[in-house]
Amino acid sequence: MDAQTKVIIIDYGSQVTQLIARRVREAGVYSEIHPCIVTAEQVRAMKPAAIILSGGPASVGEKDAPALEKGLLDLGVPVLGICYGMQLLGQDLGGELATSETREYGPADLTLTAPCPLWDGLDLGTTSRVWMSHGDKVKTPPPGFKVVGRTATLEVAAMADEARRIYAVQFHPEVHHSEDGARIINNFLFHVAKLKADWTMSSFVERAVKEMAEVVGDRHVVCALSGGIDSTVVAVLLHKAIGKQLHCIFVDNGVLRLNEGQEVVDYLREHFDLNLKYVQAQERFLSKLHGVDDPEQKRKIIGYTFIEVFDEEAKALGHVDFLAQGTLYPDVIESVSHKGPSAVIKSHHNVGGLPEKMNLKLIEPLRELFKDEVRKVAAELGLPDFIIWRHPFPGPGLAIRVIGEITEERLDILRRADKVVQQELMSSGWYRKVWQGFAVLLPLKTVGVMGDGRTYEHVIALRIVDSVDAMTADWARLPSELLERISSRIINEVKGVNRVVYDISSKPPSTIEWE
């Protein structure tokens, strides 16, 4: 990314640091997140056009609190400190800090008290609703800084040293609760740092295709296709770069949705001429799942069996050097915490176990992108809406939506019920309004009446949720008429079901999936 305008975000452990990066990118400027142990020399080598210091959970005065790296402020680029970042600037540049009487968490009204480039387009003297989350505060600004904003409880809610182009805000402009937050971030990018908006998905596609062609050369790449957007975009990007040197493998594990495997394979073969093998391994997977009702065991069996099948198919190709994966930027960020490599949150592998087992080099074309950017790339590549907007689908597939033992009969019931859910969400316009919607087959039967007879049949639960990132989720408030239509169709069209219930649990405490 050296030729591109770049903003470096120093992460001090905030839960919303990724939102800063996303807001910057939404403005058309490329951004990267780096842990706070990064050195000034390392940052200098990245050639940043601006630096943003994130918030964090620590108190600046604590013994082991993350510190401001010496030399960052000597790089000669504009700096914006947010929350903890503001407190670090206040402390290191000679201001006075204090602990707030009570920790402030939630909305506050910010009064714009003095002219400042961050406020461009906003009226001086007016208030703006912002989001606070802090325990410490800057009591007295450092020399050279002026106070440009305050709240009812904070005399120094924002400060600026325009000569050195260092700005700081105690609130979080990156979260949606801050009503003028996007404008404030954009003002920093374009009015303070004078950056240009040159981060577009068309420029990403052009560069990614060029780089992958150079890296791969005349060698070969294998890619596991799942039918989801990430692996599909990886495959289409690689195909643009290396053509028939890409070998895609789609493994049908027997727990996919109705006609899902064939639909995706047919589309990709027809529109992109992919070198694609469709492996029908349903019997192999289902025989291993026979009699298993523990969800963790289901996951492990499906994971291990997938690795076996994919490994066999890849070896049969005989001349593969690279494994392509749909790793996204949040996966990369989560692999190293804000404390650095010694405090790993998780070691992420998109296809667990495959890289080590197969001794292949990894190629990860999407590792710079957030999920919403992947969707934009998919549109840029000409992929259809049914792939771009497909709801998330778990790796173990319907195996964890059939609660209890998996049989062909129970899978068939769930597939047909789920098809009704998808059709009704789409025809009603709700499919793209919700994060995820699906059917679950419960491990019990209930009494019912159909015609003149008594029935004793299966129960379907509907799980339809709203979310932004799947970290939290709330049950979707669908119109009662839509729920009634879904229920009626399932009971009338899916043989073996006589009851439909709606899951109204939120995450937390419940998870989105039932298993």
From Swiss-Prot:
Keyword vocabulary terms for this entry: ATP-binding, Glutamine amidotransferase, GMP biosynthesis, Ligase, Nucleotide-binding, Purine biosynthesis
Keyword Disulfide bond belongs to the record: no
SUPFAM superfamilies hit by this protein: Adenine nucleotide alpha hydrolases-like, Class I glutamine amidotransferase-like, GMP synthetase C-terminal dimerisation domain
GO cellular component: cytosol
Enzyme category, top tier: ligase
Domain GMPS ATP-PPase positions: 199-390
Record function comment: Catalyzes the synthesis of GMP from XMP.
Subunit annotation: Homodimer.
Protein name: GMP synthase [glutamine-hydrolyzing]
The keyword RNA-binding is annotated on this UniProt entry: no
Substrates-to-products reaction catalysed: XMP + L-glutamine + ATP + H2O = GMP + L-glutamate + AMP + diphosphate + 2 H(+)
A Pfam family per the record: GATase
CDD domains attached to this UniProt entry: GATase1_GMP_Synthase (cd01742), GMP_synthase_C (cd01997)
InterPro entries documented for this protein: Class_I_gatase-like (IPR029062), GATASE (IPR017926), GMP_synth_C (IPR001674), GMP_synth_GATase (IPR004739), GMP_synthase (IPR022955), GMPS_ATP_PPase_dom (IPR025777), PAPS_reduct_dom (IPR002500), Rossmann-like_a/b/a_fold (IPR014729)
Active site, renumbered: C83, H172, E174
Residues holding ATP: S226, G227, G228, I229, D230, S231, T232
Pathway recorded for this protein: Purine metabolism; GMP biosynthesis; GMP from XMP (L-Gln route): step 1/1
Entry's EC annotation: 6.3.5.2
